[in-house]
């Protein structure tokens, strides 16, 4: 089983706030999305869809590795850019055949920080 499927199959018992329409959750790792106030260990609620709107934050599988990134599309150039919300991370740029290496799982609809 791939790392990605392990991430998504583990059901997290999390109280979603009223009105959150989410199909699954994942736990954020690292500091790549802190500009969107998503911190290491936060629970991210994902609505399953294979496309998101330009500029939305999505759960993306890149070569079997699950990650959260802001998605920018340039359809006229057949180009997709995945951006971290932290300037120390480079943009990930995909075009042409490279697009086959990534798969959008869904849109991030809500976040919940662990308050211990």
Regions found by a protein language model. Give the residues of each.
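Short, small-residue-biased leader/transition segments that mark boundaries at the very start
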Residues: 1-8
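Acidic/glycine-rich C-terminal interaction modules and beta/coil loop segments
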Residues: 9-116
């Amino acid at each position: 089983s791939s790392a990605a499927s392990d991430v998504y199959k583990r059901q997290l018992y999390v109280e979603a706030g009223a009105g959150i329409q989410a199909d699954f959750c994942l736990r954020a790792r690292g500091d790549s999305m802190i500009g969107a106030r998503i911190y290491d260990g936060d629970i991210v609620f994902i609505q399953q869809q294979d496309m998101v709107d330009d500029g939305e934050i999505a759960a993306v599988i890149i070569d079997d590795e699950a990650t959260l990134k802001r998605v920018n599309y340039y359809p006229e150039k057949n180009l997709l850019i995945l951006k971290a919300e932290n300037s120390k991370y480079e943009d990930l740029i995909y075009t042409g055949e490279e697009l086959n290496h990534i798969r959008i799982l869904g849109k991030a609809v809500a976040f919940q920080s662990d308050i211990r």
